[in-house]
Swiss-Prot record:
Protein name according to UniProt: Mlc titration factor A
Principal location listed in the UniProt entry: cytoplasm
Quaternary assembly: Interacts with Mlc.
Function statement: Involved in the modulation of the activity of the glucose-phosphotransferase system (glucose-PTS). Interacts with the transcriptional repressor Mlc, preventing its interaction with DNA and leading to the modulation of expression of genes regulated by Mlc, including ptsG, which encodes the PTS system glucose-specific EIICB component.
EC numbers on record: 3.4.11.-
GN (gene name): mtfA
Lineage: Bacteria, Pseudomonadati, Pseudomonadota, Gammaproteobacteria, Enterobacterales
Subcellular localization(s) per the UniProt record: Cytoplasm
Naturally occurring in which organism (per UniProt): Escherichia coli O17:K52:H18 (strain UMN026 / ExPEC)
Entry-linked HAMAP family: MtfA
Top-level enzyme category: hydrolase
Binding site for Zn(2+): H111, H148, H152, E211
GO BP of this protein: proteolysis
Pfam families: Peptidase_M90 (PF06167)
Length: 265
């Protein structure tokens, strides 16, 4: 019998958070009961430590807060919540938002442009998200805005900027970089062959190593059946870093469902 941490005494039911309902999204149904219980414990601590700030009239209720916290904690389920140190606020727009972007080109000219963003992650600042794309992160499609931005935070723990190489033993860095760049090249080749819209992996992964790590982290957790067979060596490195194997988890869940179905009388 699993003792769920959110199941409280009868007198406290009014203040209990809806963790069981929050866990019902497709992305989290493959987790075992033990993993779900551990994830909820982390998410409870996350909500105690971080401030969720709704912007532009967005309404944040307890169910939305719980689901946001669960998705933040999924990548650090085995790493620990301390891996999410370094920020204290999560800003949430109702929809993708416009920002002023500034960059310097190869000859030193500075350009300014207003662009639409789904999310942002600053090394020593808040994470910025939007609810429309958070909702689209609930399924197992390969897209997950929260995991993408969390991956950037994990990436920057290794240095001053996101490099695509998280905090791993130094002896593993060269192999990680080799496999990551090989994946980027493979994704770029597919894009050139079939176009961005028809590519099986989000084309953004080919833009630079940091984005490749973030995008493939999305696929690692929400579409492992696409990631693992295509980049098996890099997949093993991700499993070792995150200390999770979502593909094995998916197969186990499917096997359990099949067994339950065949034993229904």
């Amino acid at each position: 019998m699993i003792k769920w941490p959110w199941k409280v005494q009868e007198s406290a039911h009014q203040t209990a958070l809806p963790w069981q309902e929050a866990l019902s999204i497709p992305l989290l149904t493959c987790l075992t009961e033990q993993e779900q219980s551990k994830l909820v414990t982390l998410a409870e601590r996350f909500l105690q430590q971080k401030r969720l700030l709704p912007l532009q009239g967005f309404e944040l209720d307890s169910l939305r807060s719980c689901r946001i916290a669960l998705l933040f904690c999924l990548p650090v389920l085995e790493l620990g919540l301390e891996w999410l140190d370094g920020f204290h606020e999560v800003l949430i727009y109702p929809a993708p938002f416009v920002v002023d972007d500034e960059w310097e080109d190869d000859i030193g000219l500075v350009h300014n442009q207003r662009i639409v963003q789904s999310g942002q992650s600053w090394q020593q600042g808040p994470i910025v998200l939007n609810w429309l794309d958070i909702q689209d992160s609930f399924d197992a499609s390969g897209f997950n805005l929260i995991i993408h931005e969390v991956a950037h935070k994990l990436d920057t723990r290794n240095g001053d900027r996101a490099s695509g190489v998280p905090f791993i033993p130094l002896r593993e860095v060269a192999g990680w970089e080799y496999d990551l760049h090989a994946a980027m090249n493979n994704i770029q080749e597919e894009i050139e062959l079939v176009g961005e819209n028809a590519a099986s992996i989000d084309a953004y992964a080919a833009s630079d190593p940091a984005e490749c790590f973030a995008v493939l982290s999305e696929y690692f957790f929400s579409a492992p059946e696409l990631f693992a067979p295509r980049f098996p060596s890099l997949w093993q490195r991700f499993c070792q870093f995150y200390q999770q194997d979502p593909l094995q988890r998916l197969h186990h869940a499917n096997d359990t469902d099949s067994f339950s179905t065949t034993n229904v009388h």
